[in-house]
Regions:
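Two-component/phosphorelay signaling modules centered on CheY-like receiver
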Residues: 26-45
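The feature encodes the CheY-like receiver
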Residues: 29, 72, 90, 102
Length: 142
């Protein structure tokens, strides 16, 4: 049924959650990706700017986006707005990461649709734990 209707079944079949990591710092993207790969429960894609993040969300339909707020083109808040404006993406969780922590800015991100926020720098393990919490899944003890 799902294949006939163009609904991707690969993630369902693998039982893995789909994760999109968005940050313009490729080293950090690689670190985050490694952390989630070690957990073993994620199918991962990455993007380095807001435009690619928007395209990635539409095509990949991730369960979770780890989203840097300060991107070179479209900021994270705008990416949140775009994801939240598409009812087909209602189930996508967004975890914003940033070095800036002004309370009103974090509040603006939440209003734009972010589910959670973590301040940089953070331990990758803590990020994976937060992500698993957002997705209501247990961390694997790999």
């Amino acid at each position: 049924f799902m294949k006939d209707n163009g609904i991707p079944t690969d993630a369902l079949e693998s039982g893995k959650k789909k994760l999109l990591i968005v940050d313009d710092d490729q080293d950090l993207v690689d670190l985050i990706k490694d952390g989630f790969e070690r957990d073993g429960q994620f199918e991962i894609r990455t993007a380095n700017n807001g435009f690619d993040a928007g395209m990635g969300v539409k095509e990949f339909r991730p369960d979770l986006v780890v989203l840097d707020v300060m991107l070179p083109d479209i900021n994270g808040k705008e990416v949140c707005h775009r994801v939240r404006s598409d009812p087909a993406l209602d189930s996508v969780k967004i975890l914003c990461i940033s070095g800036m922590v002004e309370h009103n800015k974090v509040e603006e991100l939440r209003e734009a649709g972010a589910n959670d926020f973590m301040q940089k720098p953070f331990a990758i393990d803590d990020l994976v734990t937060r992500a698993c919490g957002l997705l209501e899944m247990e961390r694997s003890l790999a």
